[in-house]
């Protein structure tokens, strides 16, 4: 079962449906790490002043919004936190609209909604109502301190929440400046019939298991082949790291010996012998000193 990333309730009117939210997608792309080819050590990112090229310490970094070209308004962390919406743990439905009314470019991220044991029947009621009316629910919800516009729609036996982009984030089709050859095209009836016939000949069903990411498949096949041939590059360890490892091994050995001596109910015999030898050497040394005197 997918891990819940949010728990709360769907609210519309006086109805509350306790639910949990889980991601409907996962990132499965190839993750290329940057490496120093001389030692295979990972290469990280530095905070750099883009003008001077010098690295900047964290305490000297502030957040600002460019208000005019080259001029910024600086905001403190406290001011930014105060602007975050208050989390109510509620998916608050405020309207129901036709499912075909929302343009696809507004869709953002999908999530699955799962009811808890108390909310199963009401959850099913909302899902079935949306299915029969052809409507989707519009709602407000706060996720990870960010306010989102979202829609709820049925998907087989479940309900899906899809976050929507705010209108200010969506570019208008007017910006494409499509000319009359597109907007007022005079299409030949015979050409339309031929195109329609081609579409019908190529008609199929949605079969997601048949669609493959060929780039990822080829890269992973190449990785497996190289690994099988022993073409693996390990990070080179510095000498001081090896020294620390040796210290750890010695300490482990000492701890084991200490535990054995405790289990034996007395001092470690090796320690007793070493102590006796040390005392003997001390007495012998003292006797030689007196004779020389």
From Swiss-Prot:
Claim: DNA-binding is one of the keywords in the record: yes
Region (Required for dimerization): 216-229
Entry's Gene Ontology molecular function annotations: double-stranded DNA binding
Region ranges (Disordered): 260-293
Matching InterPro entries: Ku70/Ku80_beta-barrel_dom, Prok_Ku, SPOC-like_C_dom_sf
GO BP term, example: DNA recombination
One Pfam assignment: Ku
Entry annotated with the keyword Transmembrane: no
Residue stretches of biased makeup (Basic and acidic residues): 265-280
Record's keyword terms, sorted: DNA damage, DNA recombination, DNA repair, DNA-binding
SUPFAM superfamilies for the chain: SPOC domain-like
Domain Ku, chain residue ranges per copy: 10-195
Coiled coil: none
Domain of life: Bacteria
Assembly description: Homodimer, may form higher-order multimers on DNA. Non-dimerized protein does not stimulate LigD ligase activity. Probably interacts with LigD.
PANTHER family registered for this protein in UniProt: NON-HOMOLOGOUS END JOINING PROTEIN KU
Family indicated by similarity: Belongs to the prokaryotic Ku family.
HAMAP family the record matches: Prokaryotic_Ku
NCBIfam families xrefs: Ku_bact
Function: With LigD forms a non-homologous end joining (NHEJ) DNA repair enzyme, which repairs dsDNA breaks with reduced fidelity. Stimulates rNTP addition to DSB and end joining (ligation) of linear DNA by LigD, on 3'-overhangs and probably also 5'-overhangs and blunt dsDNA breaks. Binds both ends of linear dsDNA protecting it from exonuclease activity.
Protein name listed in UniProt: Non-homologous end joining protein Ku
Species whose genome carries this gene: Pseudomonas aeruginosa (strain ATCC 15692 / DSM 22644 / CIP 104116 / JCM 14847 / LMG 12228 / 1C / PRS 101 / PAO1)
